[in-house]
């Protein structure tokens, strides 16, 4: 039963209850008396259950992996990368580097407050630098980042505790409610519309996460908000035996290697390494992708990581988002509605994999809801060439990652094609309309998403205090 809506007007409305939305709501609740509403089209964190283990993917609408309080990060393995510039994240777009570093430190304090703390990586900085030195001898760069790992099994309770605290401070949460559009009058935002009616506010933070990227693009076009194209990353999820990654991951939990390919001179990189982890399915309704995660207590015999090739379209086609979606749809078609799984040895030999060939290998795939096939039928030639070239180069630094038995799942696509144009407070050309997190392209991981939410929250509080001060003076 849908609860009756008692209040329609708020000081601040936040669209999305992922890391950005939660941290924005927390900061507003902790540092002001403003009325705040958080709207998410998914469920509360502890009610989000993916049926894939029992029934396979039944294409829940919305997907419980991607939507709901905690966002897509809820079912990640909780890798926290405390760095101001990584991948599509670059906080120096909005502030000087010293302030960007301080903002990241501020997020860590909040994470710690709600028990989201863990072992710090690298465990040995000198050893990490030596690994980077050896990689650079092979023409490969390694980014050394302060990291913590929380575990997929711990995240839901942490997020639920944070949401409960925020609600206790007076923030209102609406679950299973989808935002359609914003209401604008004379260049200022005054509210929004959802499947349950209209709400009114002069301050709206748009933070729907990666799954909302396409919606944000259409929202921007409809309301005349400028956007810029930043490209996408397309590739595979690589799965190897733990023994191949053990020495490396004991020092650097999530090593990020950058490899420049020989034929096309494109950048490929590793991302989201999960030692003892599991490959997971992501359902984007019109197509499927893969991802990976790891628990703190439950471990598999395998390690997985994303291996991605960067794509930036310019002329005549600039819509990187649409290009990525077309790849996702084609790959899903080839896989019969499922991701495609292939042994690396089969890919190199130009033949499709079969379950018999996979079973005869020593790596047992952690995601079974797949179709054994040929990734070469699903990914563009340039991307596939980059991935094979890059993996062979990476094998010089991590011997064994390019073995015949290595498993590849496709597609893995990181959508950050569109970045909404904002000022340094992440406010758009529409007064009172702010952006935060992965969806509008201003962040690319859990920590940076939370950091970008603090920026508009601080601006809103400052503006409210200034308005209050002016009213006091006129009395």
Predicted regions and their residues:
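Residues forming the flavin
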Residues: 2-87, 126-475
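Dinucleotide-binding Rossmann-like beta1-alpha1 core, especially the glycine-rich loop
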Residues: 68-121
């Amino acid at each position: 039963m849908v609860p009756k809506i008692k209040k329609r007007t708020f000081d601040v409305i936040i669209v999305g209850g992922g890391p950005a939305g939660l941290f924005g709501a927390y900061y507003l609740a902790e540092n002001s008396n403003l009325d705040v509403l958080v709207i998410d089209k998914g469920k509360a964190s502890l009610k989000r259950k993916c049926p894939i283990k029992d029934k396979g993917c039944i294409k829940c609408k919305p997907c419980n992996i991607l939507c709901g309080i905690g966002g897509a990060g809820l079912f990640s393995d909780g890798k926290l990368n405390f760095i101001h510039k990584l991948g599509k994240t670059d906080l120096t777009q909005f502030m000087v580097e010293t302030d960007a570093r301080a903002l990241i430190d501020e997020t860590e304090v909040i994470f710690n407050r709600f028990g989201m703390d863990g072992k710090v990586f690298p465990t040995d900085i000198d050893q990490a630098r030596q690994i980077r030195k050896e990689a650079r001898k092979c023409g490969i760069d390694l980014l050394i980042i302060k990291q913590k790992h929380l575990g997929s099994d711990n995240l839901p309770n942490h997020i639920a505790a944070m949401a409960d605290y925020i609600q206790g401070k007076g923030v209102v949460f609406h679950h299973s409610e989808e935002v359609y559009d914003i209401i604008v009058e004379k260049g200022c935002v005054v509210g929004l519309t959802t499947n349950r009616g209209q709400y009114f506010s002069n301050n709206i933070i748009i933070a729907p996460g990666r799954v909302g990227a396409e919606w944000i693009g259409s929202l921007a076009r409809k309301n005349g908000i400028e956007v810029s194209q930043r490209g996408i990353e397309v590739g595979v999820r690589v799965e190897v035996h733990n023994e191949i990654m053990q020495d490396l991951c004991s020092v650097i939990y999530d090593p990020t290697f950058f490899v420049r390919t020989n034929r096309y001179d494109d950048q490929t990189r590793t991302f989201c390494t999960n030692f003892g982890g599991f490959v997971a399915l992501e359902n984007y309704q019109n197509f499927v992708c893969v991802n990976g995660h790891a628990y703190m207590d439950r471990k598999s015999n395998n390690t997985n990581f994303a291996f991605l090739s960067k794509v930036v379209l310019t002329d005549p086609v600039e819509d990187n988002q649409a290009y990525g979606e077309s790849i996702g749809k084609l790959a899903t078609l080839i896989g019969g509605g499922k991701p495609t799984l292939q042994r690396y040895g089969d890919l190199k030999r130009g033949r499709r994999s079969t379950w018999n060939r996979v079973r005869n290998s020593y790596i047992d795939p952690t995601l079974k809801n797949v179709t054994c096939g040929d990734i070469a039928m699903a990914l563009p030639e340039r991307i596939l060439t980059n991935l094979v070239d890059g993996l062979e180069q990476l094998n010089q630094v991590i011997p064994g990652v390019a073995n015949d038995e290595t498993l590849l799942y496709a597609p893995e696509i990181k959508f950050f094609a569109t970045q909404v144009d904002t000022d340094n407070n992440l406010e758009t050309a529409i007064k009172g309309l702010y952006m935060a997190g992965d969806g509008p392209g201003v962040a690319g991981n859990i920590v940076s998403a939370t950091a970008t939410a603090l920026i508009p929250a601080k601006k809103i509080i400052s503006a409210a205090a200034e308005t209050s001060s002016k009213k006091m003076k006129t009395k």
